[in-house]
UniProtKB/Swiss-Prot annotation:
Function: Catalyzes the specific phosphorylation of the 3-hydroxyl group of shikimic acid using ATP as a cosubstrate.
Protein name: Shikimate kinase
InterPro entries given in the database record: P-loop_NTPase, Shikimate/glucono_kinase, Shikimate_kinase/TSH1, Shikimate_kinase_CS
UniProt keyword annotations, A-Z: Amino-acid biosynthesis, Aromatic amino acid biosynthesis, ATP-binding, Cytoplasm, Kinase, Magnesium, Metal-binding, Nucleotide-binding, Transferase
Organism: Dictyoglomus turgidum (strain DSM 6724 / Z-1310)
Species classification: Bacteria, Pseudomonadati, Dictyoglomota, Dictyoglomia, Dictyoglomales
Cofactor(s) essential for the protein: Mg(2+)
Cofactor remark from the record: Binds 1 Mg(2+) ion per subunit.
Length: 172
């Protein structure tokens, strides 16, 4: 595999879990962008949203995205679900990596997020279901616009998804 990989998709699609497995398989460093931001600011994403607002977070996210690609010559990067909202971020992802979009239907993604622990980690889950659906719908074309590879995650377990990605990367 010649380039870095970035995983995009809505929350609950498996970006971090699958990214870690792909990282191990190809022996390339893994970085979760949200975790990187939390360590950098010494605050949870939820607290950053509450204390500073989404615009502040999105600025830090763009800055951190640039840093991630400059820190590692080759990386497997798991992004936050909203990273694609900024054209600049989509451009950085496309220029610096092969982008894999983990695509899932809204109801299936929500099933992955039903436990309380997820609600505490993800500030957007505090929004109503209709608002989340609208976010998902708004982001779909943005994910697709920057994706080199689109992988359907519905009705597949993590092993099936990981294997499919490895096969598709080998074919590249």
């Amino acid at each position: 595999m010649r380039s870095s990989l970035s995983f995009v998709g809505f929350m609950g699609s498996g970006k971090t879990s699958i990214g870690k497995r792909i990282s191990l398989f190809f022996n390339i460093p893994f970085l979760d962008l949200d975790e990187y931001i939390e360590k950098k600011l010494k605050k949870s994403i939820s607290d950053i949203f509450i204390e500073k607002g989404e615009e502040y977070f999105r600025n830090i996210e763009t800055e951190s995205l640039r840093e991630a690609f400059s820190l590692y010559p080759k990386i497997v990067l798991s992004t936050g679900g909203g990273v694609v909202l900024r054209e600049e971020n989509r451009r950085i992802l496309r220029e610096k990596s092969k982008v894999i979009y983990l695509k899932g239907e809204f109801e299936n993604l929500m099933k992955h997020l039903e436990n309380k622990e997820e609600h505490e980690k993800r500030p957007l889950l505090k929004k109503g279901r209709e608002e989340l659906y609208n976010l998902w719908k708004k982001r779909l074309p943005l994910y697709e616009s920057c994706a080199d590879i689109i992988v359907e995650v519905d009705n597949k377990d993590i092993d099936e998804i990981t294997f499919e990605i490895i096969e598709r990367l080998r074919d590249d």
